[in-house]
Swiss-Prot record:
Domain of life: Eukaryota
Keyword Transit peptide attributed: no
CC annotations in GO: mitochondrion
Protein name (Swiss-Prot/TrEMBL): Cullin-associated NEDD8-dissociated protein 1 homolog
Outcome, altering K16R: Does not affect interaction with CDC53
Origin species: Saccharomyces cerevisiae (strain ATCC 204508 / S288c)
Post-translational modification comment from the UniProt entry: Neddylated at Lys-16.
UniProt cross-link Glycyl lysine isopeptide (Lys-Gly) (interchain with G-Cter in NEDD8), position: K16
Known partners and oligomeric status: Interacts with unneddylated cullin CDC53.
Record key words, sorted: Isopeptide bond, Ubl conjugation, Ubl conjugation pathway
Biological process annotations from GO: negative regulation of protein ubiquitination
Described function: Assembly factor of SCF (SKP1-CUL1-F-box protein) E3 ubiquitin ligase complexes that promotes the exchange of the substrate-recognition F-box subunit in SCF complexes, thereby playing a key role in the cellular repertoire of SCF complexes. Acts as a F-box protein exchange factor. Involved in the aging process. Longevity-assurance protein.
Region entry Disordered, spans: 339-364
Length: 660
């Protein structure tokens, strides 16, 4: 033990003055060696304070500031970036002491939470936490967590005390998982999955705790634990966990929708669709939970896969989903109609009562009541309070039902905006009826009734001069779409053998059409058509390579670099690109652009890949996981290996690995 740490511990132990203790703990600790200085400081000073100290100011100082700040300062040191010591010297001793000193367990686990929270709130840190040591400690923590849960139940603590005790464990476990598995960019959550027994325990604890909560909804802290755990779950394990999940749990974790791809059709068939049809409707669960799950899963029926241009959900499942939701919407419409009629009827009754004999100002009635009171009758029998309270209860219940109906209606309409319901007259009529009862955003209705176009447009027309077309689009003049598209299709065709200057001029025209002039009303399909025309020109064209010779010196000059740079720059400006276009773009970039001999072109290609993957990675592994692995990732990997190219993209955005 170093001299200054030894002296500090001795000074603290030798004084009874709390002010002096506080000052000693407030000083900046300069730790140079983990084993020789940090370990004795924690074990011989800070842990004893947490276990023995009676002064709350000193206790809170160590728990919320001294220990968390000390750990953070150590992590910031590159020499201590391998963080096995955080578990062995900080977390494990805190947990062990909580098991020994039950009366201080809350303070000790709270301190563990504070340490991990301090690390999480400093995202700039660059560190690596060994997975094996984490898994061992996580298992130990869960065992203690379950034991504590049993002890709390046995002690029959008040609800608020029991809740705070369990929440601190739940929050700590969530932070522990994030610290262990989200710390290293080289090991993202898609590559690291928790063992099934740990996952099963986590979900069981979360659901058991939520079941004791008087509120039906899952609290935010428990929800965070469920979301973190789902991110660390392999789809194969999710398939085993789903049958045990309650609907409110599934509603929470379905926000990590991209993990459910391999099992989503079965999930709709077994768990979701039955709830949408009578007589099962609403009997076994909260309908709002099911609607939330369906909405969270909307990419599975709203986005077409790259490999076959079809949604991941089967046609029959989507058809049943439409039918079930339409039936629910019809029932909700009837309920809203009844509510509206009752409100109108109630309003009429109020108007009639003002003209009748029920007036509070009727002198004969008041005289009669006064006489009853004077004869000893209980005036409370006639004051109407009980009837008013019953009426208020009924009104509150009706208002709650109406609010629930409106919430469910809006959620169903949101789902239909992703479903692209077929243009059926009965659906349009139902929307018109609903608009008379509740406020519905017109843009939402437009989206619901819009037709989904998947076919690429065809253009027939004459071929015009490119310079003339460029002047036309630059001047924002009325555009002859057919002429422009036919001309570009001709000039950009590989078979046409266009000169380099013609190709560059074509790219400039497209740049004005898609980027610089947004008033040309280019549809999504037309944009895709133009992109398909330019992508083949990302491959180096040998006819644009000139060879210069001067004596024995030979130099090759690639005149096509400018063209390829223009194309990649255009694609970057069009970002975010439509998902449907990635099936053409990603393999082309992986096969040609990343291996381009020009470093500028190569750099632009990696910029584009980085943007695409950061935006669409969850969609690619959630909907197109097989295509992503076979048609893009392996192509990129082979290109990088063959050309000895280093990129972090292969580590940051891996495909799903086979499950053990």
């Amino acid at each position: 033990m170093s001299l200054h740490i030894s002296k500090l511990i001795e000074q603290y132990r030798s004084t009874k003055d709390n002010d002096l203790k506080y000052m000693l703990l407030r000083q900046n600790f300069k730790i140079n060696d983990i084993e020789d200085e940090l370990a004795p400081l924690v074990n011989e000073l800070l842990l004893p304070v947490l276990v023995e100290e009676q002064d709350m100011e000193i206790l809170n100082l160590v728990s919320f500031q001294v220990l968390p700040d000390l750990v953070l300062s150590m992590i910031s040191d590159p020499a201590a970036a391998q963080l096995g010591w955080v578990i062995s010297l900080i977390c494990d001793p805190l947990l062990n002491q909580s098991m020994i000193h039950a009366n201080r367990s809350f303070v000790l686990i709270e301190t563990l939470r504070n340490v991990l929270q301090k690390i999480e709130n400093s995202p700039h840190l660059d560190y690596h936490q060994p997975v094996n040591s984490s898994l061992e400690f996580i298992s130990k923590f869960i065992v203690e967590m379950k034991r504590h849960m049993c002890d709390v139940d046995a002690a029959q603590l008040s609800h608020s005390l029991s809740e705070s005790n369990m929440l601190i464990y739940i929050e700590s476990l969530n932070l522990l998982l994030k610290f262990s598995f989200f710390s290293d960019a080289a090991s993202p959550s898609v590559m690291v999955t928790l063992p099934f027994d740990i996952l099963n325990d986590v979900f069981t604890i979360a659901q058991d705790y939520s079941a004791t909560n008087t509120n039906e909804s899952i609290d935010r802290i428990t929800e965070k634990l469920l979301l973190t755990s789902t991110q660390l779950t392999h789809p194969v394990d999710l398939e085993n966990l789903c049958p045990k999940m309650k609907y409110n749990t599934l509603a929470a974790v379905s926000r990590i929708w991209y993990k459910f791809g391999p099992i989503v059709d079965k999930l709709f068939t077994n768990r979701l669709l039955p709830v949408l049809f009578p007589p099962q409707m609403g009997e076994e669960c909260n309908v709002e939970d099911v609607l939330e799950i369906v909405h969270n899963f909307h990419p599975y029926f709203s986005i077409r896969r790259l490999k076959d241009n079809r949604p991941l959900l089967s046609d029959s499942t989507i058809s049943q989903l439409r039918e079930g939701l339409f039936g629910m919407l019809s029932i909700l419409n009837d309920s809203l109609t009844r509510t509206q009629n009752e409100n109108d009827h109630g309003s009429d009754n109020l108007i009639d009562s003002d003209d009748g004999f029920g007036s509070d100002n009727d002198p004969e009635q008041q005289a009669y009541l006064d006489e009853l009171v004077s004869e000893g009758y209980d005036e409370n029998m006639y004051d109407g309070d009980t009837d008013d309270e019953d009426a208020d209860d009924i009104n509150v219940e009706k208002n709650d039902e109406a609010t629930k109906d409106i919430t469910e209606t809006n959620k169903i309409l949101l789902i239909f905006s992703e479903l692209h319901y077929p243009q059926e007259e009965r659906f349009s009529e139902l929307l018109v009826e609903l608009q008379t009862k509740i406020a519905i955003n017109t843009s939402l209705i437009d989206k619901i009734l819009s037709k989904e176009t998947t076919e690429l447009p065809t253009h027939n027309g004459e071929i015009a001069d490119l310079n003339e077309i460029l002047n036309e689009v630059k001047g924002n003049k009325p555009i002859r779409k057919n002429v422009i598209f036919c001309t570009l299709a001709h000039t950009l065709s590989l078979q046409s053998g266009s000169e380099l200057s013609v190709l560059q001029l074509s790219i400039e025209v497209i740049d004005h059409l898609l980027v610089k002039n947004h008033s040309n009303n280019i549809t999504r399909g037309e944009q895709f058509q133009l992109i398909k025309l330019i992508l083949p020109h990302l491959k180096t064209n040998k006819s644009f390579i000139d060879t210069l010779k001067a004596g024995n010196f030979t130099q090759k000059i690639d005149e096509g670099v400018t063209l390829r740079t223009m194309i990649l720059s255009l694609l970057l400006q069009l970002f975010p690109l439509d998902y449907s276009m990635l099936g053409e773009i990603l393999p082309t970039i992986a096969r040609y652009s990343v291996r381009d001999k020009d470093l500028g072109v190569r750099d632009l290609s990696f910029q584009l890949l980085d943007q695409i993957l950061r935006t669409y990675y969850n969609y690619l592994i959630g909907i197109d996981w097989e295509w992503y692995k076979d048609d893009f990732y392996q192509v990129l990997q082979e290109t990088c290996i063959k050309k000895d190219i280093n990129t972090n993209l292969l580590l940051q955005f891996p495909p799903y690995l086979p499950h053990d």
